[in-house]
A protein has these predicted regions:
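Catalytic metal-binding acidic patch
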Residues: 33-67
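Helical scaffold of the NTase/Pol beta-like nucleotidyltransferase catalytic core
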Residues: 1-25, 150
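Conserved nucleotidyltransferase catalytic core and NTase-mimicking acidic/glycine-rich helix/loop elements
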Residues: 146-264
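Acidic/Ser/Thr-rich, low-complexity mid-to-C-terminal regulatory regions of eukaryotic proteins
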Residues: 99-145
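Short beta-strand
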Residues: 28, 78-82, 167
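Generic non-transmembrane alpha-helical segments
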Residues: 10-20, 65, 69-73, 156-157
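Short, solvent-exposed beta-alpha or beta-beta edge segments that form flexible loop/patches at the rim
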Residues: 24-34
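Conserved catalytic core of two-metal-ion nucleotidyltransferases
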Residues: 63-113
Length: 272
């Protein structure tokens, strides 16, 4: 954690030396406390909000500018590449994604959000990472601190299954299934057995759009379609069946079968 704190400050300072930055902050799963180890397999996300004068260059050119600016700072020895919606810095111990953003105009329907670069389609897309952090914290409080550990368990399943879901999609799906406020939620404990409910609901929910809970109007699940969608649903169904098998084994006083079933779902993260 100390390494991440030091590194993210260094990256933000590097960007600020090269560009006119009006704000910068840590975001993503690290900020929402849902990052799972090992850190080397994860991304740490940083948003840099740039002066509006850069925006006329267009999304792809803005990311190229950020990339070149960071190359000037880090020189040789560090891989820095444009990667979809971010500039990716590959350090030896973990990866940092630098997301270039611009404030939404005051008259926009979501003026508290940010426009970020989608270099693949050379377009701007709207997001609101600070609101995502607020939603995550509120949801975790509603579940008496048990939702963040639950999401980490689900991310362990996702990694063990070959990452069929994007990390944030998985989190938003968990918010949708378990609820995000004290007056509407499905109470959860962070035991392994409780994940069974998620997989049961996810099988159906994965086949429908999932609106960004921050109110940006974006479908978080839009990337998932065709064979990839069917594979993700199949994996959720398999995980449900294995969790169900584990619960039946527990009732039959067969701990060995229970542990094996959970281990097949959660991989090395299962500590039972």
């Amino acid at each position: 954690e100390k390494t991440v704190a030091t590194r993210q400050k260094s990256v933000r300072a590097a960007a600020e030396r090269q560009l006119t930055v009006t704000d910068s902050f840590l975001t993503g799963s690290y900020r929402r406390q849902t990052l799972i180890s090992p850190l080397k397999q994860a991304d740490v996300d940083i948003v840099i909000v740039l002066d509006s004068s850069y925006k006329s260059r267009g999304p792809r050119a803005v990311l190229d500018l950020v990339r070149q600016s960071l190359i000037e700072e880090y020189k040789k020895g560090t891989k820095i590449s444009r990667n979809g919606q971010a500039v990716t810095i590959t350090f030896t111990d973990f990866i940092v994604d630098v997301v270039a953003a611009f404030p939404r105009p005051w008259w926009a329907w979501d003026s508290s959000g940010l426009d970020i670069c989608d270099s693949g389609r050379d377009r701007w897309i709207t997001t609101n990472p600070k609101r995502h952090v607020e939603i995550s914290a509120r949801a975790n409080r509603a579940h008496d601190g048990q939702l963040v550990p639950r999401i980490k368990q689900l991310k362990a399943w996702n990694r063990n299954a070959g990452d069929p879901l994007h990390s944030f999609h998985l989190e938003a799906l968990a918010w949708s299934i378990f609820g995000t406020s004290w007056w509407w939620y499905n109470s959860q404990a962070s035991d392994w057995a409780g994940a069974r409910y998620f997989f049961k609901r996810a099988y159906d929910k994965l086949s429908t759009p999932l609106a960004d809970p921050a109110g940006t109007g974006k479908d978080i699940a839009a990337y998932l379609h065709g064979d990839a969608l069917q594979a993700a649903r199949s994996m959720a169904r398999t995980a449900f069946e294995r969790c169900d098998r584990a619960q039946k084994a527990l009732k039959e006083d067969d701990p060995a079968t229970m542990h094996e079933a959970y281990r097949r779902v959660f991989g090395d993260c299962y500590t039972g």
